[in-house]
Curated annotation (Swiss-Prot):
It comes from the Bacteria. The beta subunit is responsible for the synthesis of L-tryptophan from indole and L-serine. It catalyses: (1S,2R)-1-C-(indol-3-yl)glycerol 3-phosphate + L-serine = D-glyceraldehyde 3-phosphate + L-tryptophan + H2O. The modification N6-(pyridoxal phosphate)lysine is found at residue 96. It comes from Clostridium botulinum (strain Alaska E43 / Type E3). The keyword Nucleotide-binding does not apply. GO terms for cellular component: cytoplasm. InterPro entries: Trp_synth_b_CS, Trp_synth_beta, Trp_synth_beta/beta-like, TrpB-like_PALP, TrpB-like_PALP_sf. Pathway: Amino-acid biosynthesis; L-tryptophan biosynthesis; L-tryptophan from chorismate: step 5/5. This is Tryptophan synthase beta chain. Tetramer of two alpha and two beta chains. Belongs to the TrpB family. Gene3D superfamilies: 3.40.50.1100. Signal peptide: none annotated.
């Protein structure tokens, strides 16, 4: 595979990344998603759209976000140097706003009046509510009851921003069910609404759109790292639930001699229902309108999943990630709850940066890998900040003293 031409070849015109991707939709929804795909290909490549998105990123989002060298954390581990791409400093505190502003701008150009989406940890919901307020659009966010309880600050933010938060009370009451609920609502309202998927998954064109809007993260990081150090990192890593921050981080490095590692949540362990590590334990399947690797129960349905990180507990992964693993270009590893929480507290104490629990999975892998490497450099996408998590963390883990004995 020549990765210098990869972006021109994938996805193909049908939204396929090799055997993954596509659009598996009801007859009712096919024209709605075709409308979005056609609009994306025409509107989003226009000079007017690109110019406006650049202005928004600079003036509203505060981009570019910096790359930061974790000197104290690196020193505590050894000689390998850990760097962070600080998406926690993007407006609203996570990478999610990168694609939400793009989707909101697209909706505005298309003449839609409402944004509909699901959210897990609440960061996508907050980002989309922010985009809706910015563009003067209505916003409807579907969120599982379990996540509403865990992520109360983000629920409050969404409501302050004017969004309607719809509690989802069926099934496990988490991210997968929230997607189901949002899909149902969109099916009834697609003529005046746009569905804004929260990750690099779903029916075509969303894996493509979200990847393209998020790629600003990797392009910035690549240039910034080279400017800081004079070379490329040895390893690039990011957490993977659906895979939006990872897709944005990885794409610009595909053609470079860099190891690229996605980190999935192992949760409490290997037993089905105790983790959300789709790539490690899943198999090919179709869910939520796209084909990828997914966790299945004994009946072939989406399996119950768990992660301490609400934004990672999804039983599948974006189709491009499945394809990149198949090509052998990106490897995928797992980190459990305990390892993620140790990284959460150590980054907080050593660097004064409180990370999102989702991002802590990638930091945990970087810490583990740094011990093995002994030298060189690792660049981590710190996808978000941990403000949303602190009440939950203190209730279940205290203030982290156990990690510093």
């Amino acid at each position: 595979m020549d990765f210098r031409t990869y972006l021109k070849r994938y996805p193909d015109k049908n939204g396929r990344f090799g055997q993954y991707g596509g659009a598996y939709l009801t007859n009712e929804l096919i024209p709605a998603f075709e409308e979005i795909a056609d609009a994306y290909q025409t509107i989003c490549h226009s000079s007017q759209f690109i110019s406006e998105l650049r202005r928004i990123r600079k003036e509203f989002q505060g981009r570019p976000t910096p790359v930061y060298h974790c000197e104290r954390l690196s020193r505590a581990i050894g000689n390998c140097q850990i760097y962070l791409k600080r998406e926690d400093l993007n407006h609203t505190g996570a990478h999610k706003l990168n694609h939400c502003m793009g989707e909101g701008l697209l909706a505005k150009f298309m003449g839609k009046k409402r944004l509909i989406a699901e959210t897990g940890a609440g960061q996508h919901g907050v980002a989309l509510a922010t985009a809706a307020a910015f563009f003067g659009l209505e916003c409807e966010i579907h969120m599982g009851e379990v996540d509403i309880a865990k992520q109360a600050p983000n629920v409050t933010r969404m409501k302050i921003l004017g969004a309607k938060v719809v509690p989802v009370t069926h099934g496990l009451k988490t991210l997968k069910e929230a997607v189901d609920s949002a899909f149902d609502s969109y099916a009834k309202n697609y003529k005046d609404s746009i569905y804004c998927i929260g990750s690099a998954l779903g029916p075509h064109p969303f894996p493509l759109m979200v990847r393209d809007f998020q790629a600003v993260v990797g392009y910035e990081a690549k240039d910034q790292f080279k400017e800081m150090t004079g070379f490329l990192p040895d390893v690039v890593t990011a957490c993977v639930g659906g895979g939006s921050n990872a897709a944005g981080m990885f794409i610009p490095f595909l053609e470079e001699p860099v190891d690229i590692i996605g980190i999935e949540p192992l949760g409490r362990g290997e037993k089905l229902g105790d983790h959300a590590a789709s790539m490690k334990y899943g198999e090919k399947g179709v869910m939520h309108g796209f084909e990828s690797i997914m966790l299945k129960d004994k009946n072939g349905n989406p399996a119950p999943v768990y992660s301490i990180a609400s934004g990672l507990d999804y039983p599948s992964v974006g189709p491009e990630h499945a394809f990149l693993r198949e090509l052998g270009r990106v490897d995928y590893k797992v980190i459990n709850d305990e390892e993620a929480m140790e990284a959460f507290f150590k980054l907080s104490r050593y660097e004064g940066i409180i990370p999102a629990i989702e991002s802590s999975h990638a930091v945990a892998y970087a810490m583990k890998k740094a011990k093995e490497m002994k030298q060189g450099s690792i660049l981590v996408c710190l996808s978000g900040r941990g403000d949303k998590d602190i009440d939950y963390v203190v209730e279940h883990y205290g203030y982290g003293e156990q990690y510093f004995k």
